[in-house]
Amino acid sequence: MDFFYLIGGAAVLLMTFLLHRFGNAWIDRLYASHRDILTFPLAVKERGRLRRFLLPLAFLLCGARAVYIASSPVELFFLLFAAAFLLLMTATDFEQYCLFDAMMLLFAAGGLFLSLIQLPRLSDHLLAAAIGGAAFLVLAILSRGALGGGDVKLIASLGLWLGRDALLFVTMAGIVLGGFAAFLLMLLRLKKRKSAFAYGPYFALTALALFMLRSV
């Protein structure tokens, strides 16, 4: 077990460095190639300043927790994989109110691969992705822009990782937390009622917290 902690800790440190170096660079490239969908295209540098330090720091903390709770190298891999992508997507949604398909597809592929490994859970996770995605598609249409296509894809992707019961918890908690944050911002007059608001981070961070509590 001490050897596992040693190797796991080394892997976390390596991935933290890679996320700092290449994760930030990936986000910058996505911003540069998708300027037409950015909410704040003229403030990319300003809004991304804190991310360059907070992203690796958050991953390092999640990685330390993952090493502690993981029972196998495979479990640790999926925990670190999920943490990295959830943090990357949280960063882009907070900064520019957008979630990129390139990140979403890789995250969804990781969830599908995990479901295939845990074969008895496969049908539940596929159902969660289908039902969650369909439900949020309807909500996105009814909300007239409050929820976007990125949120729909995020929920469907999370379904592949979580299954129905856990996805229901994450969506309910994310809606409550996002609603509270929006209300607080309006109360402080930092947002207006019709201002754009990112809900994706509240789903992503709730899922991440759940992974850090119970593993994948």
Language-model regions, residue ranges each:
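A membrane-topology feature that recognizes alpha-helical transmembrane segments
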Residues: 1-216
